[in-house]
Amino acid sequence: MDVAVIGTGYPEIIGLLEDLSAINKDLKFIGFLDDNPNNNSRKLYGNKIIGKLNWIKHHKDVYVINSIFRNPYSREQVTLKLKEFGAKFFTFIHPSASYKYASIGEGSIICRNCILEPGVSIGEQSVILHNTVISHDSKIGKYNFIGNNVTIQGKNLIGDYVTISAGSSTCPNCEIMEGSLIGINSFINKNIPERCILGSPPSRIIKTNQKFPELNKYIN
């Protein structure tokens, strides 16, 4: 099975595909598709851009992975364009992920060491980055981006086009509605209305110019 990656903004996908192809010998990564000529100079670790998105119209035996995902709406636009070209979407699940009794929508990306517990459902074209845990019976919509080291507790309901940034966590039975953006290291203990931006709790300096004996109070 030949696979092309859409977009060059997430070169880490190369390593993820290599992990999978080490197990699935039929899988072959053949290169990137990108419409932006400014990306031609990107470092692609020995790989190359083989064409623009419309390349897929003439290579319909090739599966695609959409790696444009920081903006869920841009991801949807690219997906719809690819569907017009007749693209077939590859659902990427890293071999280290645990997902028995979970359902995963077409074209989604599940990265290293993710845990999707029984009863979890993931909509189409959603992205779950490394070391994220989604607990039992939680429902994740389509075109979502969930960052590294996120913990979603049981029976959460996550709408479509939601971004949950790295290190965030939720309480059980929470709902995050469509289009909301959750900042880094956020703690969600209530429902979040649609199209909200939840800010991160930035670190702050509490003391300066401390000597080592003073620092030891905070380290030990």
Task: For the regions a language model picked out, list residue spans one by one.
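Short hydrophobic segments within beta-strands
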Residues: 6-7, 33, 67
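Glycine-rich adenosine-cofactor-binding loop
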Residues: 1-18
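Phosphate-bearing ligand-interacting subdomains
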Residues: 37-98
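Short active-site oxyanion
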Residues: 1-3, 29-30, 61-64
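Structural signal for interior beta-strand "rungs" in well-ordered beta-sheet cores
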Residues: 92-206
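Short, basic/aromatic-enriched C-terminal tail that caps enzymatic domains
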Residues: 200-220
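NAD(P)-binding Rossmann-fold cofactor-contacting core
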Residues: 23-42
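Short, solvent-exposed amphipathic alpha-helical segments in soluble enzyme
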Residues: 19-23, 80-83
